[in-house]
Amino acid sequence: VLSPGDKSNIKAAWGKIGGQAPQYGAEALERMFLSFPTTKTYFPHFDMSHGSAQIQAHGKKVADALSTAVGHLDDLPTALSALSDLHAHKLRVDPANFKLLSHCILVTLACHHPGDFTPEIHASLDKFLANVSTVLTSKYR
């Protein structure tokens, strides 16, 4: 459960990310593909080269979904329902991959905003990404 302090930290951190979110999403995906090569199996049609248009486009989708989630911290299941259906029923992504991507998102944000990435912000963002992952895997049953 996200505390009021967590929600405040998440909104503040996301506000500092601003227009860089799509680039950070793409960077986090590239980081995940390089660090955890098995995750590439869900993207066989992607050009995996650095900065490819497909990775950039999917990074924007990831960032947009997270921005939606930040705007609906009190009702993530409703806000992410369609995305949850897509990942559970059509894409059938292994739920473990959400944890891997979450880690790569945290690393990416820490690299770009080291002064703002305090232990409190890190903890709040980690809880937020864990909640998003839980919602995205909730319809797998």
Swiss-Prot record:
InterPro entries per UniProt: Globin, Globin-like_sf, Globin/Proto, Hemoglobin_a-typ, Hemoglobin_oxygen_transport, Hemoglobin_pi
Primary gene name: HBA
Protein's UniProt name: Hemoglobin subunit alpha
Phylogenetic lineage: Eukaryota, Metazoa, Chordata, Craniata, Vertebrata
Subunit structure: Heterotetramer of two alpha chains and two beta chains.
Tissue-specificity statement: Red blood cells.
Annotated positions of the N6-succinyllysine modification: 7, 11, 16, 40
TM regions (residue ranges): none
Positions of the Globin domain: 1-141
Alphabetical list of PANTHER family matching this protein: HEMOGLOBIN FAMILY MEMBER (PTHR11442), HEMOGLOBIN SUBUNIT ALPHA (PTHR11442:SF48)
Sequence positions bearing Phosphothreonine: 108, 134, 137
Annotated source species: Tupaia glis
Family: Belongs to the globin family.
Keyword tags: Acetylation, Heme, Iron, Metal-binding, Oxygen transport, Phosphoprotein, Transport
